[in-house]
């Protein structure tokens, strides 16, 4: 698998985390309070590392995800700091810039990902999944600390699962808010590890 093929596969796998379905009902008062706090976050930045393990490929990259109401941007860089891929989403459309200087644009991110992967998928929920919100999951489970522990979803013929393996306290509005800093995305033959080393909540 070439670097370009891996990047396209990783991007599509990451975005698949936001595919629509119906979540289970959770009535914990503590969880509802935590969920409401997360839902007030609209602007944030997340920096970290990712590891991809597939049947015939392993990759390690750094990532930077910037999200606001006006713009979402995902940048993947190599260990040497070279940009491998940059995805930008605005109300006007979406653009992908690759490591080999190719630029692809579309009216929306769904169309762009379809051109890259041949799959139609929504990207709207990705910021929520990073924050630990189970927006439109098939099923999910909570930890004893009333944070999101796992997500399950059926995507085509594949069963995907996100495990939230570790949280860290982030200072926000004069309080501490537990946010994910280690996630694992798995399906039958693919594993993607995400480690978020820094959160910056700007609103």
Curated annotation (Swiss-Prot):
Entry keyword Acyltransferase: no
GO CC annotation terms, alphabetical: cell outer membrane
Keyword Transport: yes
Subcellular localization(s) per the UniProt record: Cell outer membrane
Signal peptide stretch: 1-18
Major localization class: membrane
SUPFAM superfamilies: Prokaryotic lipoproteins and lipoprotein localization factors (SSF89392)
Bilayer topology annotation: Lipid-anchor
Biological process annotations from GO: lipoprotein localization to outer membrane; protein transport
Keywords: Cell outer membrane, Chaperone, Lipoprotein, Membrane, Palmitate, Protein transport, Signal, Transport
Record-linked Pfam families: LolB (PF03550)
InterPro entries, A to Z: LolA/LolB/LppX, OM_lipoprot_LolB
Residue positions of covalent lipid attachment, annotated as S-diacylglycerol cysteine: 19
Lipidation (N-palmitoyl cysteine): 19
Function text: Plays a critical role in the incorporation of lipoproteins in the outer membrane after they are released by the LolA protein.
Subunit annotation: Monomer.
Family statement drawn from the similarity comment of this UniProt entry: Belongs to the LolB family.
Entry-linked HAMAP family: LolB
Name of the protein in its database record: Outer-membrane lipoprotein LolB
Lineage: Bacteria, Pseudomonadati, Pseudomonadota, Gammaproteobacteria, Vibrionales
Gene encoding the protein: lolB
């Amino acid at each position: 698998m070439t670097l370009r093929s891996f990047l396209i596969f990783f991007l599509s796998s990451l975005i698949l985390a936001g595919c629509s379905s119906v979540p289970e009902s959770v009535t914990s008062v503590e969880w509802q309070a935590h969920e409401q706090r997360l839902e007030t976050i609209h602007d944030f930045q997340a920096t970290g590392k990712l590891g991809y393990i597939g049947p015939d490929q392993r990759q390690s990259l750094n990532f930077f995800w910037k999200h606001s109401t006006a713009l979402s941007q995902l940048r993947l860089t190599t260990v040497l700091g070279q940009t491998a891929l940059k995805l930008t989403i605005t109300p006007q459309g979406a653009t992908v810039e690759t490591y080999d200087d190719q630029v692809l644009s579309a009216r929306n991110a769904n169309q762009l990902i379809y051109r890259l992967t041949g799959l139609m998928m929504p990207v709207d929920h990705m910021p929520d999944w990073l924050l630990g919100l189970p927006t439109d999951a098939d099923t999910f489970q909570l930890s004893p600390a009333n944070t999101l522990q796992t997500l399950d979803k059926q995507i085509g013929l594949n069963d995907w699962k996100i495990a939230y393996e570790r949280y860290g306290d982030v200072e926000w509005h004069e309080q501490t808010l537990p946010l994910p800093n280690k996630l694992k995305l798995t399906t039958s033959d693919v594993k993607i590890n995400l480690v978020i080393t820094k959160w910056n909540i700007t609103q």
